From Swiss-Prot:
<dbReference type="GO" id="GO:0005758">
    <property type="term" value="C:mitochondrial intermembrane space"/>
</dbReference>
<feature type="binding site">
    <location>
        <position position="289"/>
    </location>
    <ligand>
        <name>[4Fe-4S] cluster</name>
    </ligand>
</feature>
<dbReference type="GO" id="GO:0051537">
    <property type="term" value="F:2 iron, 2 sulfur cluster binding"/>
</dbReference>
<comment type="function">
    <text>Component of the cytosolic iron-sulfur (Fe-S) protein assembly (CIA) machinery required for the maturation of extramitochondrial Fe-S proteins. Part of an electron transfer chain functioning in an early step of cytosolic Fe-S biogenesis, facilitating the de novo assembly of a [4Fe-4S] cluster on the scaffold complex NUBP1-NUBP2. Electrons are transferred to CIAPIN1 from NADPH via the FAD- and FMN-containing protein NDOR1.</text>
</comment>
<protein>
    <recommendedName>
        <fullName>Anamorsin</fullName>
    </recommendedName>
</protein>
<dbReference type="InterPro" id="IPR049011">
    <property type="entry name" value="Anamorsin_N_metazoan"/>
</dbReference>
<dbReference type="GO" id="GO:0005634">
    <property type="term" value="C:nucleus"/>
</dbReference>
<feature type="binding site">
    <location>
        <position position="247"/>
    </location>
    <ligand>
        <name>[2Fe-2S] cluster</name>
    </ligand>
</feature>
<keyword id="KW-0496">Mitochondrion</keyword>
<comment type="similarity">
    <text>Belongs to the anamorsin family.</text>
</comment>
<comment type="subunit">
    <text>Monomer. Interacts with ndor1. Interacts with chchd4.</text>
</comment>
<dbReference type="GO" id="GO:0051539">
    <property type="term" value="F:4 iron, 4 sulfur cluster binding"/>
</dbReference>
<dbReference type="Pfam" id="PF20922">
    <property type="entry name" value="Anamorsin_N"/>
</dbReference>
<keyword id="KW-0963">Cytoplasm</keyword>
<dbReference type="GO" id="GO:0046872">
    <property type="term" value="F:metal ion binding"/>
</dbReference>
<feature type="region of interest" description="Linker">
    <location>
        <begin position="171"/>
        <end position="223"/>
    </location>
</feature>
<feature type="binding site">
    <location>
        <position position="275"/>
    </location>
    <ligand>
        <name>[4Fe-4S] cluster</name>
    </ligand>
</feature>
Amino acid sequence: MADLGVKAGDKVLLVWSQPSSPTTLKELAESLGAMVGTDGRVSLENMERLMMSSHAASSYDWVLSSVLSDSFSVHTSETLAEMARVIKPDGKLVLEEPVTGTDDQKVRTAEKLISALKLSGLVSVTEVSKEPLTPEAVSALKTYTGFQGNTLSRVRMSASKPNFEVGSSSQLKLSFGKKTSKPVDKPVLDPNAARAWTLSANDMDDDDVDLVDSDALLDADDFKKPDASSLKAPSCGDGTTKKKKACKNCSCGLAEESEQESKGAKTISQPKSACGSCYLGDAFRCASCPYIGMPAFKPGEKIVLANTGLNDA
């Protein structure tokens, strides 16, 4: 245990589990006591009674769990959380646990053990060593857990508690004052770059500069007024077997022609009076008069009849 880094004045919690030899446990406790000296302390705790103990939070510099060669234990998430609770900030946890090479409900893999340590709030989780279990330990583990696999090994993990307490708070210094920004220097304009984009009047009068005459761009045909038929697209209203249909955003006049045709088709010729006295009222109208039931109107006034009335007439 000398390679762990336990020094004088440290407080160590040694967690042991069955089966453990009392002699081996006593020798390890005495060895740790000699390391920490009179200013330190070594406490012993059984794994099964750890959750029922009343250890103060953040009271140990070290927690050593199942590090005896003749013992083993599968650490639950509750046990790992309790160990993380009693460790001081920046304290260390060293544990040993049997792992398997394949996923199993009884014994987990080394990767899952690392994940469980991180979920308990510990950091800097590293795998220190890994060695095969002795036949006696394998037999005892199968009896204890019911595991029936053969890919078993013993792994030692090291982890640290963060240098702050869980749930601790710290005041943040925030400044909401308006910050004065330094004046930004205006970039200096390159005279060569400005000269490249400048065209002077002298350059316009230069004989080497070819200017295009705008009047020469049009010929005599461009000034002729186009015929309406020439403006129509080849496919505009095309087809003799189908009705002419104007294109979208038509500009050739076909849309106006179609609109006039549709208005003319909707015009209904109103029946004309034969007696000339229909406008006076029902008293002066014939029995088959289409204006029966309508009020009197002025001569020449436009009257629109319903389709039902025309059908009945």
